[in-house]
């Protein structure tokens, strides 16, 4: 979650979870910035640089039909009075890392049974227990989908260590049926003497 950063010269420290019109939001290389308003993603930016927030969703007497605009503006002002002068909106900035995440280690908790055919003509079959250990990397390709399905409404930050167990579990759930399929193919063991 992004944090406000008022300048030293500013007399206004700003409010948490309120983004004012024209605010500059820095987006670094390898990041995707999401602006969430009232729990809904309203802006997405994945280009490095400064993103300028445009709050043109607020009604103004200077746009549209004067009578309608004036009525909408008074409704907004009345709503602000009920919220103590604030906008009454919860606005948040979230940054999602789009770079490749480092090595995530995995291993099988229990051995996986695997059958190997040693000699088909003699009917020798061998069952072995396999253990798998290794590492993998991952990358968030669709930050919007990741936000909505995995980490929405995080109070401070969602670390890679929080998603690693889920990724490991999904890898193991995919690996075991794949090994079972290989085992069903009756793989033939090739010894050094038969090569």
What are these regions, as identified by a protein language model?
Residues 57-58, 159, 194:
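Short amphipathic alpha-helical patches
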């Amino acid at each position: 979650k992004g944090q406000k950063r008022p300048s030293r010269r500013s007399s206004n420290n700003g409010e948490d979870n309120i983004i004012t019109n024209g605010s500059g939001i820095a987006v670094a290389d390898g990041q995707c910035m999401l602006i969430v308003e009232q729990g809904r993603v309203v802006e997405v930016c994945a280009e490095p640089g400064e993103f300028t927030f445009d709050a043109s969703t607020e009604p103004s007497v200077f746009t549209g039909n004067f009578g309608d605009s004036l009525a909408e503006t008074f409704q907004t002002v009345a709503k602000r009075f009920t919220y103590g002068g604030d906008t009454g909106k919860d606005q948040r900035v979230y940054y999602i890392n789009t770079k490749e995440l480092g090595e995530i280690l995995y291993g099988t908790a229990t051995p996986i049974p695997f059958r190997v055919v040693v000699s088909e003509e003699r009917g020798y079959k061998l069952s072995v227990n396999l253990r798998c250990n290794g590492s993998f990397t991952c990358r968030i390709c669709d930050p919007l989908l990741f936000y909505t399905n995995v980490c929405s409404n995080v109070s401070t930050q969602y670390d890679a260590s929080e998603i690693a167990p889920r990724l490991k579990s999904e890898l193991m759930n995919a690996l075991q049926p794949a090994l079972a399929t290989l085992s069903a193919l009756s793989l033939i063991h090739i010894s050094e003497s038969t090569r």
